[in-house]
Amino acid sequence: MRESSQIRETTETKIKLSLQLDEGKNVSVQTGVGFFDHMLTLFARHGRFGLQVEAEGDVFVDAHHTVEDVGIVLGNCLKEALQNKEGINRYGSAYVPMDESLGFVAIDISGRSYIVFQGELTNPKLGDFDTELTEEFFRAVAHAANITLHARILYGSNTHHKIEALFKAFGRALREAVERNAHITGVNSTKGML
């Protein structure tokens, strides 16, 4: 089974995270940031991943360190769980509508970290979650996992719906990218490595 568990402790946060790429039944998320918990749960459910997150952070300051560090640990776990990346599709993409909003995510498990994030989040805060942290989370995941990630909000008016569409699209795109493919021998690259 492709899985990874890691702990990251700093003076700002303590993150314990486990990710199972091939088993999506066990999802439990507690970060102390309610909206972020909701988004991570949606990501796991729509990607059919197992995900357990326990996070403690300096949320009395704001949620920035917690959200970013969870992204770092998730990216690290993804990188470790994929091992040598043999036999996977490598690429994945998904459009996801959420009522009036439409989100799109494309992923390349390339071994090169890069992110493009496009979208207007008009409401600056949802509960304890600063909406600008959406981009910070995706950036942290992409850099830690060494993947290329494009996330785009095509349109919408409700900020909650826009972010929800992105997290669901992220789960679905990542599921496609990590899926094993019987037609792929070795790694899906002419270089012979990713």
UniProtKB/Swiss-Prot annotation:
Compartment(s) of residence: Cytoplasm
Gene Ontology molecular functions: imidazoleglycerol-phosphate dehydratase activity
One Gene Ontology term from the biological process aspect of the record: L-histidine biosynthetic process
InterPro entries noted in UniProt: IGPD_sf, ImidazoleglycerolP_deHydtase, ImidazoleglycerP_deHydtase_CS, Ribosomal_Su5_D2-typ_SF
A Pfam family: IGPD
EC number(s) recorded for this UniProt protein: 4.2.1.19
Record keywords, A-Z: Amino-acid biosynthesis, Cytoplasm, Histidine biosynthesis, Lyase
Pathway terms, separated by semicolons: Amino-acid biosynthesis; L-histidine biosynthesis; L-histidine from 5-phospho-alpha-D-ribose 1-diphosphate: step 6/9
Catalytic activity: D-erythro-1-(imidazol-4-yl)glycerol 3-phosphate = 3-(imidazol-4-yl)-2-oxopropyl phosphate + H2O
One GO cellular component term noted in the UniProt record for this chain: cytoplasm
PANTHER family registered for this protein in UniProt: IMIDAZOLEGLYCEROL-PHOSPHATE DEHYDRATASE (PTHR23133:SF2), IMIDAZOLEGLYCEROL-PHOSPHATE DEHYDRATASE HIS7 (PTHR23133)
Family: Belongs to the imidazoleglycerol-phosphate dehydratase family.
Protein name: Imidazoleglycerol-phosphate dehydratase
Organism this protein belongs to: Bacillus anthracis
